[in-house]
Design a protein with these regions (language model features):
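N-terminal single-pass transmembrane signal-anchor helix
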Residues: 15-47
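N-terminal leader/signal peptides at the extreme start of proteins
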Residues: 1-21
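Conserved hydrophobic/amphipathic alpha-helical signal-anchor segments
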Residues: 2, 14, 46-92
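Periplasmic/extracellular, small/polar-rich flexible segments of pilin-like filament-forming proteins
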Residues: 72-167
Length: 167
């Protein structure tokens, strides 16, 4: 009787060793992976939008510096990006334009083309010249998150008219 019991016990242990996961175990693993993916995906998409904004911020900064150089040589601000010869990104996410008000300021805009889908915000930069002190000042502004695609308008150094000052 004892040998029969040993045989049944060993055969039962062998079956368990050869068996795979139960359906419940597999479902629990799938649910855990789904929850982790649901948490990580929005964070990942937010990082992609931030990377695209970083490219626009760099271009606006380059346009601000180019405006300073152009003004130093010509005595006036440039009216378009082609004159400044700053290589702009390919234009899939932002449209870059220069809006010159007068000989004391130049506003450069980076308008988000598809801000809702891309997770990007419009930006603008301002280059200001003070003829009294003969000094330049610059600012880079970013629109609020979830706002429309219109770039903020800088009102002077460190003034973005209610939008976020990022430089």
């Amino acid at each position: 009787m004892a040998s029969n019991f040993k045989f049944k016990l060993l055969s039962q242990l062998k079956k368990r060793a050869e068996g795979g996961f139960t359906l419940i175990e597999l479902l629990v693993v799938v649910i855990i992976i789904g929850v982790l993916a649901a948490i990580a995906l929005p964070n990942l998409l937010g990082q992609v939008g931030k990377a695209r904004e970083s490219e626009a911020k760099s271009t606006i900064g380059a346009l601000n510096r180019a405006q300073q150089g152009y003004f130093t040589e010509k005595g006036t601000f440039a009216t378009d990006t082609e004159t400044l010869e700053v290589p702009a990104p390919d234009g899939n996410f932002f449209s870059f334009a220069v809006n010159t008000a007068d000989n004391t300021e130049a506003i450069q805009d980076a308008t988000a083309l598809n801000w809702e889908a891309d997770g990007t915000r419009s930006m603008s930069g301002g280059t200001f010249y003070d003829s009294g002190t003969r000094a330049f000042s610059t600012v880079v502004c970013r629109a609020e998150a979830g706002s429309e695609d219109t770039p903020p308008t800088p009102g002077g150094a460190n003034d973005c008219g209610g939008a976020e000052v990022i430089k």
